[in-house]
Amino acid sequence: LLTGTDPVCFEVVDGWSKPAAAVPQAAALGSDGRVRERPSGAIREEDAGAERPMFLETIVTDGIPGRPQAATRSVQIEDEADFYDSFGVSAYAYSGDWNEQCKPNLMYNVRVSRNAVSNRWVPDGRRYFWPKNKEWVRFFAYAPYSLPSGSRLLSTANDGGIPKIRYRVPANVTDQIDLLIATPDAVRSEDYDVLVYPGKGMPLTFRHALTAIQFRVKSVAEQNSGRRIRRVQLADIPTTGDCTMQLDAEGGLIWEIPRGTSATRNTYTFDLDIPLVSGQQITEGDQTLMMFPHTIQADLYIHVWLDGENLDQTAPHSFGIQGQTWPIGKTVTYAFSM
């Protein structure tokens, strides 16, 4: 690979979706554009004999909520101010059409950090230069560079085609990350310094690769006033998946999530003491689950215990969520009413 004298650097572009108004997942839009809730929007708990049954509504909002603090594990990234301190990049230089034989011959899984002097994102350790003898350069990036245990870039330096990344969701909720992926269009290398990004760097617009899951109380009947939530549990969730770092036709990312064995699934339990009050948020911030976007095929359940109910026994309130979709880059909030 014949390189020139223009160093490769990057610009992180604010491209994250901002949270929007909450919309019930089972809602329909009327001719006037307003949200219409279908009768099936709220799921009744599975205990058919419950005297005062609990109901569950699924609410989907655009984007993933951010928090104004330095970006580390468990932070949901909303803009560049929250961004991670480094990310990984692979760069493929090639001529003609992109094909599965193209390899990361320019950069392979290089750590990139912000230079405090130039305020630009530059590769750690050494400089890389734009090629002179190749027509195109294509970049693939992920953040953060330091992934949780069991997660890694699957593709090697000798593998051709679109790279894949394996992600394993940490068992500890506070260790979970807001995984970000950037897949910009190929850049014509000879035009870089003249037409594209002089003095700034190759722009990377990162997208949320996961789905945020939260819980809250929607409404409480007067006869249930004063009760408290003691535990919420999301059971038997897949925790290992492979992401192809290329956008699909709908602008999402392609995840392969095997059902697997108990080693690739987990149950997340929140032990709480929260009043059952209308509008009460149950989990948020670093208690937000960051899960794989997918349509739930298996028999997955949300379990709830209230005060006075034995935590050592089967959950009195259970909701099956098979068939629901966790959309990529969005927040799914499960709201309880009783």
Predicted stretch roles:
Residues 220-221, 294-338:
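Exposed, polar/acidic Ser/Thr-rich sequence context and nearby capping/turn residues
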Residues 1-5, 85, 95-97, 232, ...:
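Solvent-exposed loop/turn and edge beta-strand elements of beta-rich ligand-binding domains
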Residues 24-30, 39, 271, 275, ...:
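Low-complexity, acidic Ser/Thr/Pro-rich "mucin-like" tracts of secreted and single-pass surface proteins
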Residues 7, 119-131, 269-272, 282-294, ...:
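Exposed aromatic-hydrophobic patches
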Residues 116-121, 254-257, 322-334:
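Short, surface-exposed linear segments at secondary-structure transitions and domain or protein termini
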Residues 2-226, 306, 325-327:
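Short, low-hydrophobicity acidic/polar segments
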Residues 180-197, 201, 205-287, 296-298:
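Short helix-loop boundary/capping segments
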Residues 96-111, 240-245, 310-319:
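Surface-exposed loop/edge segments in extracytoplasmic proteins
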